[in-house]
């Protein structure tokens, strides 16, 4: 069993996957241009078994109130798998599969799998959560940090959400849906026809983030990077919109990045 870095190539595209650093995508290079912010905490990390913040780190699991560590006090953020070591199940020139077994502090055993597939103009990731025992609520999503500037001007973010989740003082959705507001964002949006966000680096590259999932968090309040995060439910969704993983029904999502030079 190995968790050494994996390099995938197709055409002039190259992806590095880092199983040993939380199962994150460490690099996406197109030609000689790096699209992801570099650094141990950056790249693109998996959010699982929840996305964004859980209010006070607590969620109802059947009749049991579960408490997660408050890693973003007073809340718990972005799941546990990004802090663990994943294992490589298989790898080839342009495809790889890695897995992670859920352990404490998450209260239930389960397995998370990510499948990565690279072509010369697209990169697709599928993530699933399976249980062999108890059913439990879970979410999956991804948190990429795209470099704001690739050398020729700041990225433009274009998308047409149906609504924005109103954000409360505690940083969590209030439950009200509002008209989408202009940037700056650290906000969750509803896209009922599927996530479809276009990033344009003027004169260089256009990249589309697409998913059949209906929720996306967009975060552009940092100077170095912009985050476009497809996910299976909104922040605090383990409480507000719980979706169960059962022995016959995994939670699964797919995200595709596709690009073209300008």
Predicted regions and their residues:
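A short, structured loop/turn motif at beta-sheet edges
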Residues: 60-64, 89-95, 117-122, 149-150, ...
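Short strand-coil-strand connectors
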Residues: 9-11, 31-33, 62-64, 119, ...
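Beta-strand-rich recognition/accessory modules
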Residues: 1-10, 40, 97, 103, ...
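Active-site/ligand-binding surface loops and adjacent short beta/alpha elements
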Residues: 135-137, 144-212
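Acidic, contiguous internal or C-terminal segments within carbohydrate-active enzymes
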Residues: 8, 15, 19, 100-149
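Extended, loop-rich substrate-binding clefts of extracytoplasmic carbohydrate-active enzymes
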Residues: 69-120
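Short, charged beta-turn/beta-strand-edge "cap" motif at the junction between a beta-strand
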Residues: 66, 72-74, 131, 257-262
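Acidic-aromatic substrate-binding/catalytic surfaces of carbohydrate-active enzymes
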Residues: 13-71, 226
């Amino acid at each position: 069993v190995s968790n050494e870095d994996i390099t995938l190539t197709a055409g002039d595209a190259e992806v590095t996957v880092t199983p040993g650093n939380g199962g994150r995508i460490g690099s996406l290079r197109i030609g000689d241009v790096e699209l992801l912010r570099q650094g141990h905490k950056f790249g693109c990390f998996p959010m699982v078994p929840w996305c964004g913040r859980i209010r006070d780190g607590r969620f109802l699991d059947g009749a049991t109130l579960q408490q997660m560590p408050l890693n973003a006090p007073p809340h718990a953020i972005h799941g546990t798998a990004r802090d663990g070591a994943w294992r490589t199940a298989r790898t080839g020139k342009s495809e790889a599969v890695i897995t992670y077994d859920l352990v404490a502090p998450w209260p239930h055993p389960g397995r998370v799998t990510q499948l990565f597939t690279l072509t010369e103009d697209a990169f697709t990731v599928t993530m699933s959560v399976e249980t062999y025992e108890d059913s439990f609520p879970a979410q999956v999503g991804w948190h990429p940090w795209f470099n704001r500037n690739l050398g020729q001007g700041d990225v433009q973010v274009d998308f047409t959400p149906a609504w924005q989740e109103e954000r409360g003082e505690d940083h969590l959705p209030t439950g009200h849906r509002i008209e989408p507001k202009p940037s700056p964002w650290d906000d969750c949006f509803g896209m009922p026809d599927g996530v479809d966000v276009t990033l344009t680096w003027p004169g260089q590259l256009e990249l589309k983030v697409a998913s059949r999932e209906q929720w996306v968090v967009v975060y552009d309040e940092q100077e170095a990077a912009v985050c476009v995060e497809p996910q299976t439910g909104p922040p605090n969704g383990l409480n507000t919109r719980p979706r169960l993983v059962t022995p016959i029904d995994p939670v699964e999502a797919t995200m595709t990045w596709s690009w073209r030079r300008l």
